[in-house]
Structure formats: C-alpha cells, structure tokens
Amino acid sequence: MIYVSRRLIITCLLLLIACVMAGVWGLRSGAVTLETSQVFAALMGDTPRSMTMVVTEWRLPRVLMALLIGAALGVSGAIFQSLMRNPLGSPDVMGFNTGAWSGVLVAMVLFGQDLTAIALAAMVGGIVTSLLVWLLAWRNGIDTFRLIIIGIGVRAMLVAFNTWLLLKASLETALTAGLWNAGSLNGLTWAKTSPSAPIIILMLIAAALLVRRMRLLEMGDDTACALGVSVERSRLLMMLVAVVLTAAATALAG
C-alpha cells in the first residue's frame, strides 16, 4: 500500500487551486477583458457566438497548453535530476533542447512551414540527440558526469550547425525560425496542438508508471539491481520519456 503524506496532499491541492486561478485569469485577460462570470458562461455556451469563440477557440487552447507544457517540462526536469544527481543534468545544458531546435530548422528548410512536420521534427531531433549523447557516453555502462560533459559538447556542435542552417536559409524562413525559437503561445489553436499534446499526455502517463523504478534508482545502482531493476535499460527508458516530453513541449511553444 502506497503511503501518501498529508503534506503532499496539501501541496497538490494548493498547486491545483493555483492552476485553476491562473487558468481563469488567462481566460479573462486579453485585448478584451472579460468578467469571471462571462468566462464561465462562455464555457457553457450561454454567451454570444463572438464571445464564446474568443474564450473557447482562442484563449482556452493557450491556457490548457500552457499548463500541459509546464507539466511536461517539470516532469522532464525531475526525471533528469533524479537520473543525473547533478544541477547540470538538465535538457537545455545537455543539448536536447538544441537538438529539438535542429530538427525544427531542418524541417523548415526542407519542408517549409508545415506544422505537423515541424512538431515531429522537433521530437525526432531531441530523441536522436539524446541517443547520440548516450552512445558517445557509453563505456560498459553510463557515468552521469561523462554523460553531462558529452552532452555539453554535442550541444556546442548543434549550436554551430543551427547557425549554419540559419545562414543558408531564406530570409523569410530565418525570420520565422527566429520567432519560433523565441517561444510563444500566441496563435496556438486546437488544430495546432496535434500531435504534440497527445504525445505529452502519453509520456506523462509513462512517467507515472516509471516512478517506482526512478525511486529505486535513487537508492543506488546496486540496490536497484538487487531489487530486480534493469539499471541501464530503465535509465535509457526514463531519459527517452524525459526527452520526448521536452521535445514535444518545444514543438508546441518553441
């Protein structure tokens, strides 16, 4: 039986309340400020069509995706910190975000502005980068310090590659890529949430299923192995989940 502390329950409730309050504020705010009662009426469909569209088609996707992206990045960071046990063990420092950005640039240069291609390319770029770092760091097992150092080196090479792609791209593509790289939820609609949002939800479920392995790995490799955990396979699986979460979030918001 899993014991859940009162402190954890209270913390989760407070975070849930904060998310609801932030969501309502996000639905109210914009070029046209709405009252809270108007927001709830629009969600129920009891307002004029124009107001309902503003709330449900424009603001609601951005609010929900902001919460989903925050959850993805938070869980991804927690997984990396658990695996690396080092403040430098984060997706941005190790180059996985940069790998996703490389995938986006390649998609923009080769496939134009197709949103589905860009989203998939971001995830492929992040996954390929993580596998490359993992393979380069493998020496009869993975040492986290070596993994971080190699990740920093791969990130530096990808930054140079991305700069070269931007220099070779057309002016329009370079400007679009620069705006995308800045990161924004502006213009995000329901149609643009696929395939990234479903993938994030699936990876969050996968992360929840891997919590037991993660806790055992935190006790040390020998202890985890004695308790029946395949250490290297579990590490690779958790890292892939964390990378996909980061890449999918990057595909949504830049």
Predicted regions and their residues:
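Alpha-helical transmembrane segments in inner-membrane proteins
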Residues: M1-G254
